[in-house]
Amino acid sequence: MTKSELIERIVTHQGLLSSKDVELAIKTMLEQMSQCLATGDRIEIRGFGSFSLHYRAPRVGRNPKTGRSVSLDGKFVPHFKPGKELRDRVNEDEEEGF
């Protein structure tokens, strides 16, 4: 699902909200989450999951075009850990044949 598809779904289910209002709310939420992660903060949404940063150590990689070894610096990458309710719901749907 893309961001625009999510906006459409919310607008369809919530008749009182305009497409522009939903778009602004989602943009604001994503921007705030990005800013929190950029400063090293952890985001926890109970029942859904948590977002945090994991450190990837420096390593030697390979350029796929040339096959030559390339030194890659260490970096932080966003990580999502699903909450129990989300895991249970996904597995519940899987058991029903979805």
From Swiss-Prot:
Database matches in Gene3D superfamilies: IHF-like DNA-binding proteins
GO MF annotation: an example: structural constituent of chromatin
InterPro entries to which the protein is assigned, alphabetical: Hist_DNA-bd, Histone-like_DNA-bd_CS, IHF-like_DNA-bd_dom_sf, IHF_beta
The keyword Transcription is assigned to this record: yes
GO biological process: DNA recombination; regulation of DNA-templated transcription; regulation of translation
GO-annotated cellular components: chromosome; cytosol
Keywords on record: DNA recombination, DNA-binding, Transcription, Transcription regulation, Translation regulation
Keyword Lipoprotein belongs to the record: no
SUPFAM superfamilies hit by this protein: IHF-like DNA-binding proteins
Role noted for this protein: This protein is one of the two subunits of integration host factor, a specific DNA-binding protein that functions in genetic recombination as well as in transcriptional and translational control.
PANTHER family: DNA-BINDING PROTEIN HU, INTEGRATION HOST FACTOR SUBUNIT BETA
Subunit record text: Heterodimer of an alpha and a beta chain.
Similarity field: Belongs to the bacterial histone-like protein family.
Identification of the protein by name: Integration host factor subunit beta
Name of the encoding gene: ihfB
